[in-house]
């Protein structure tokens, strides 16, 4: 693939110039036009936010989501080819690269969360004037939140990762083969960092001109300190719940402290005032973006409605989200199009040939909401997820109304997907939000109603959160599926030896196995059947 060739070339160039040229090249990309001799922390910060691994870009969806996490979670439809569960080494190398280093000029220099963060650290450390340093702190703290959020996802995909030493060439100028750090320790560092960042934003005060500069460069939250605080606290809640089966005492103590002190630890939970655009943490597309996902989802036949989600979870309860998520579709017979009369997901029990010849008989992802929607935002975290997390915590440990949080999460999920549908006004008129009575009836159906044993209620919560994630958040969906073992998915076994079923982690890319001498410390556990530290259920 062209991006892999570009990567190989970039590695060669990196080895040639790493002693000094790498940092200079990055800095040259983002000179402040008002200060022609100093690279700009502000511009590096904006570049951290401008992330096509957060936005639903063609490349991320086509090469990572629909070939990896979407399949491993059954959040996308897919063909049961023999290689369906085999990791694509080139594409997962790309995913790794896009965290650790910026892209080439050919792909817009996108990505490089860790590299840009280290440059911000370095520039911040070089500031001598106390007032200037105080003013620059807001960019450093926001950059920390973004880096911690993205680093947690790399841990969730691979496990132990280079972290505290990663990108050190951009701070010290020294070439260091970064050690692989224990995943649990990385999580601890992330959790502490998120807490400190949230507390900073709770009381930060800046001169008007500095706040205006931050707002201008902040293409994620437009300089709103309250939302940065909620963002950091919400990601912290997500990660604490993720480790709650391996370190329940820590998770319980810290989560209940968050939930019992909403004035100190506000969350992006929305409550009765939920409006997706203003409540959720969403990365909007650039104003120049005109692409959509129809090629990413159709090139390898990933547009069919997932079997378990539609047939087992949603149809039996007449889920109000169905019209926003799916089209009934149809098939062509001669020159006549025969529309399907109902929503049905493509059976996962079919072999690949049966699936392909029958695609037209089954529902597909909604064309207005997903296939041809150029306005889809990148989803960082939503109020619905936050309330599902609150419901789980209160169900397991008490202290709040788990039922109310669960029902709020589902209501917000319905609103969210109709919001996504409403963003596309070019292919058809937006759908009307379901009536309140229809949603109330849905919430009282046996499969959805918050009744049963504690384990049954937790399972309902986890399944509904899985539905809410969908393919757009399949990285989170895969993490939660492995953590909770819900829903109870069945996979069509592949005949390819060693790849009969989906993996429980990604194996490390060749950039680490071939060029990082410290890979030896993790080599023995670098197996697709290995487990991330929180995967103990």
Segments from the language model and where they lie:
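Conserved, well-structured interaction surfaces
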Residues: 79-164, 168-204, 208, 373-378
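Bacterial Sec-dependent N-terminal signal peptides
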Residues: 1-31
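Hydrophobic-face positions in mid-chain alpha helices that act as interaction patches
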Residues: 218, 251-390, 395-464, 468, ...
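Internal, well-ordered domain-core segments that constitute the primary functional module
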Residues: 188-270
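Membrane-proximal, proline-rich intrinsically disordered regions
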Residues: 22-80, 111, 125-130, 489-537
């Amino acid at each position: 693939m062209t991006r892999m060739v570009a990567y190989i070339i970039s590695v060669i160039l990196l080895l040639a110039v790493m002693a000094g040229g790498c940092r200079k090249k990055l800095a040259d990309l983002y000179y402040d036009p008002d200060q022609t001799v100093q690279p700009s922390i502000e511009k590096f910060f904006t570049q951290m936010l401008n992330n096509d691994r957060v936005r639903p870009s063609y490349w991320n969806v086509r090469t990572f989501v629909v070939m990896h996490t979407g399949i491993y979670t059954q959040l996308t439809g897919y063909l049961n080819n023999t290689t369906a569960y085999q990791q694509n080494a080139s594409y997962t190398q790309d995913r790794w690269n896009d965290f650790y280093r910026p892209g080439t000029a050919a792909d817009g220099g996108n990505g490089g969360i860790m590299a840009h963060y280290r440059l911000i650290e370095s520039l911040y450390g070089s500031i001598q004037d106390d007032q200037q340093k105080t003013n620059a702190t807001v960019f450093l703290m926001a950059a920390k939140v973004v880096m911690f959020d993205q680093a947690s996802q790399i841990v969730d995909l691979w496990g132990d990762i280079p972290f505290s030493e990663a990108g050190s060439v951009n701070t010290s100028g020294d070439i260091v083969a970064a050690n692989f750090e224990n995943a649990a320790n990385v999580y601890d560092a992330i959790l502490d960092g998120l807490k400190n960042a949230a507390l900073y934003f709770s009381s930060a005060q800046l001169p008007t001109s500095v706040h205006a500069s931050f707002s201008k460069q902040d293409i994620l939250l437009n300089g709103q300190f309250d939302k940065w605080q909620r963002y950091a606290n919400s990601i912290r809640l997500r990660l604490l719940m993720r480790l709650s089966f391996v370190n329940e005492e820590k998770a319980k103590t810290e989560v209940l402290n968050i939930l019992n002190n909403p004035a100190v630890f506000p969350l992006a939970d929305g409550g009765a005032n939920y409006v997706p655009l203003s409540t959720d943490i969403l990365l909007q597309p650039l104003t120049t973006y005109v692409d959509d996902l129809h090629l990413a989802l159709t090139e390898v036949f990933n547009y069919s409605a997932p079997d378990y989600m539609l047939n087992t979870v949603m149809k039996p309860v007449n889920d109000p989200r169905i019209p926003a998520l799916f089209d009934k579709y149809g098939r062509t017979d001669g020159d006549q199009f025969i529309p399907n009369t109902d929503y049905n997901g493509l059976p996962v029990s079919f072999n690949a040939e049966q699936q392909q010849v029958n695609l037209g008989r089954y529902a597909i992802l909604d064309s207005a909401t997903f296939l041809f929607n150029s306005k889809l935002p990148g989803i960082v975290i939503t109020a619905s997820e936050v309330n599902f997390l609150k419901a789980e915590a209160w169900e397991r440990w008490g202290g709040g109304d788990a039922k109310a949080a669960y029902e709020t999460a589902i209501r917000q999920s319905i609103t969210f997907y109709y919001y996504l549908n409403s963003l596309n006004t070019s292919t058809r008129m937006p759908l009307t939000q379901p009536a309140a009575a229809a949603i109330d009836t849905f919430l009282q159906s046996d499969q959805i109603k918050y009744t049963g044993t504690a384990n049954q209620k937790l399972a309902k919560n986890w399944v509904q959160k899985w539905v809410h994630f969908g393919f757009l958040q399949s990285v989170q969906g895969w993490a939660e599926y492995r953590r909770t073992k819900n829903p109870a998915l069945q996979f069509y076994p592949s005949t390819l030896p060693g790849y009969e079923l989906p993996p429980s982690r990604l194996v490390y890319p060749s950039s680490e196995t071939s060029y990082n001498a410290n890979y030896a410390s993790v080599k023995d556990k670098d197996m697709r059947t290995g487990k991330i530290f929180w995967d103990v259920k």
